[in-house]
A protein has these predicted regions:
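N-terminal strand-loop-strand beta-hairpin
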Residues: 1-129
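Beta-strand-connecting loop/turn residues
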Residues: 121, 139-140
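Charged, well-structured binding/catalytic surfaces in domain cores that contact anionic ligands
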Residues: 130-138
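Glycine-rich, acidic/polar active-site loops that bind/position phosphate-bearing ligands
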Residues: 143
């Protein structure tokens, strides 16, 4: 499993204001892509009320749509949290697949069910020192 470091925050301004701030700080657009995630959960865990604990038991069936290619994969995200719900360790592992529908059918047969669909539009900006990934989630939230 590949472990990662990162910070996720919800942005309080609109996308236009955020892009203006990035441009003023010499950030340039490097990449644009979309991710369509289907979160699947083992039925025995579906009634967990703690959202962070619930997400520990999910598998993502993911369609990544870039300008010149499309990648379909199963993703498992591993996260550890502190007592305040902050991520202290995270990683993920991926397995490429040929069909989103066949993957959903396989997990249904294994006792999983669809929990939620999340559609992300991602913009990657970078300058000489830093890189930011702007994630527009379901056309409502910006991270």
């Amino acid at each position: 499993m590949k472990f990662e470091k990162g910070i996720t925050i919800e942005v309080s301004c609109n996308i236009e204001e955020l892009l203006k701030i990035l441009k003023e700080n010499d950030f340039e657009l490097k990449e644009v892509y979309d991710i369509k995630d289907i979160y699947m959960i083992d039925k025995k865990y579906k009634n967990i009320e703690d959202k962070l604990e619930l997400l520990k038991h999910t598998i993502l069936i993911r369609d990544i749509i870039e300008e010149n290619k499309e990648t379909k994969q199963i993703t498992y995200k591993y996260k550890e949290y502190d007592e305040n719900g902050n991520i202290t360790k995270q990683g993920k592992t991926n397995c490429k697949i040929n069909s989103i529908e066949e993957a959903v059918n396989l997990f249904n047969a294994l006792g999983y069910e669809k929990l939620i669909n999340i559609n992300d539009h991602l913009l990657v900006y970078a300058n000489k020192d830093d890189e930011f990934v702007i994630e527009c989630v379901n056309n409502k939230h910006i991270y």
